[in-house]
């Protein structure tokens, strides 16, 4: 039996929350915990956990947290990932670029994005919406200030409580669009119910036209090996790993003003990822691997570099 067969539970709802490593792990965790705590108050069966198999937990790397909610006992509780999510949540808007956020979604699924941009803009980056039935946007950053705490290390119970930062309004937007739990039960478990209610009230929801689902073709792994130049061998990259493109960790990118640049190459010296090349035209940035750390902008003595939000660019 495949894992997809294990997930054939009609009353099970799967929620996948995408966030950025280290700096946003807690927000993703708070969202899934808030939703499952609210569901538990309604007598439902729940699970909430985080995924550490994507990539090493580094700053800005795409990471996931999961929730499962059902009115029946969850039979597939030992499956580590949500392979067919019903609800996908993006804690940070640039995750819509270069990250397979819609992989495996079920027909009728919902996408919730924390952004101040329009739904039309989000659709431009999505391209094929697949099985999505609705898109939701909520400007959670303007609704609740992030709370800093010294209460403990990563993974510890945080004294600020569930949903103290942007998680509360995002969770409110999820409930508005899906009704997965009662909004009053959600208000009872978040630290900032006012922010949650604002997210619930102000979230923008758009229904999408029906999309004919496309069944994934089942391909034998053995057959794929036989199609390679030499059966049984796996080609390895010579100069770079195409599967490890770190540019999708970026939430902002450096933009250079050539007129202001003095070609001192201080940025080239300080770049921790060797993404800057010295050329006759001045510094050139490799956006395929630039993580948008902002160090080059910080050390530029002439102010020729500016950090610009990643979603301002279509490439």
UniProtKB/Swiss-Prot annotation:
User: Which cofactors are reported in the record for this sequence?
Assistant: [4Fe-4S] cluster
Positions with a binding annotation for [4Fe-4S] cluster 1: 261, 264, 267, 300
Residues binding [4Fe-4S] cluster 2, per UniProt: 271, 290, 293, 296
pH dependence as annotated: Optimum pH is 8.7.
User: What are the recorded GO MF terms, alphabetically?
Assistant: 4 iron, 4 sulfur cluster binding; metal ion binding; oxidoreductase activity, acting on the aldehyde or oxo group of donors, iron-sulfur protein as acceptor
Q: Pfam families this protein is in?
A: Fer4, POR
Free-text remark on how the cofactor is bound: Binds 2 [4Fe-4S] clusters per subunit.
> Looking at its record, which EC class is this enzyme?
oxidoreductase
One GO BP annotation of this record: oxalate catabolic process
What EC number(s) does its UniProt record assign?
1.2.7.10
Q: Which UniProt keywords apply?
A: 4Fe-4S, Iron, Iron-sulfur, Metal-binding, Oxidoreductase, Repeat
Query: Where in this chain does the record put each 4Fe-4S ferredoxin-type domain?
Result: 252-280, 281-310
Q: What is this protein called?
A: Oxalate oxidoreductase subunit delta
Q: Which organism is it from?
A: Moorella thermoacetica (strain ATCC 39073 / JCM 9320)
Q: What broad taxonomic lineage does this protein's source fall under?
A: Bacteria, Bacillati, Bacillota, Clostridia, Moorellales
